[in-house]
Amino acid sequence: MLILISPAKTLDYQSPLTTTRYTLPELLDNSQQLIHEARKLTPPQISTLMRISDKLAGINAARFHDWQPDFTPANARQAILAFKGDVYTGLQAETFSEDDFDFAQQHLRMLSGLYGVLRPLDLMQPYRLEMGIRLENARGKDLYQFWGDIITNKLNEALAAQGDNVVINLASDEYFKSVKPKKLNAEIIKPVFLDEKNGKFKIISFYAKKARGLMSRFIIENRLTKPEQLTGFNSEGYFFDEASSSNGELVFKRYEQR
C-alpha cells in the first residue's frame, strides 16, 4: 500500500532530529524551475497570491531567495520531521523507530506544491507554496498544469517498487487533484473521518486532518499491507462503520465526548 498525505504550512526546523538518515528529493529539477518563477514575486505579490499577511509574505520571499540547489543537513531537514500541521500531530513521526522510518520511506508519500512528491526522509528546505496557488509558469497558469503527469508517474514508480497496486488517499482534495487517477496504476481507497456534533456525524476539518495522521501512523506502526486491515483502526475513539462505507471509501466515525 502507498499512503498519500498533504504537506503542512507550519514548519519545524528547531526540534532535535530523531534520525540522521536522509535522502534527496527526486524532482528537484522541477522545484528549481518553480523557485525561479517564485523569485520574480515581490512580498506584496506573494501576500496577494497566497492570501497571507505582509509579515508571512516577507518570510516566504526570503525563503525563495535563500533556497539552494544543494541540499545538506545544514540547510534542510527530513520532510516528515519538518512538517508540523494537524496531520503531523496525529502522525507523530518524531517518535518513530528506525524500522518505522524504513517502512514509511517505502509506503508513505507527501504531495507538495514545490517538491511534487516527497519521501519521508527526503531533505526539504523551508517553503510555502500550496498546490492550489495560481503561480504562472512556463507550463501553464497554475501548479496543476506545471506538474502535469509528473507526480502521477512518480507515484507509479513507488507503487511498482513496493509491491502492490493500492493507494490509500489521506491527502486533501487540493493536493490529490495533482494526481491523475485514470493514469495511476492503482486501486484508490479513501478513508473518511466523521465526528459527531449535536447528534449528527460530519467532517470537522481539524479532527479529520489529525485522523489522517493517526491512520498513517496506524498503518506504519502495524506494518499493514492489505486494505481490509484498515478497518481495525480505532485510535482516539474512531471506529469503522461498514454500513456507511463503499468499495472505494472507508468511513470511520467518532462519538461526541460528553
Swiss-Prot record:
InterPro entries: YaaA. GO terms for cellular component: cytosol. One of its GO terms (biological process) is response to hydroperoxide. Belongs to the UPF0246 family. This is UPF0246 protein YaaA.
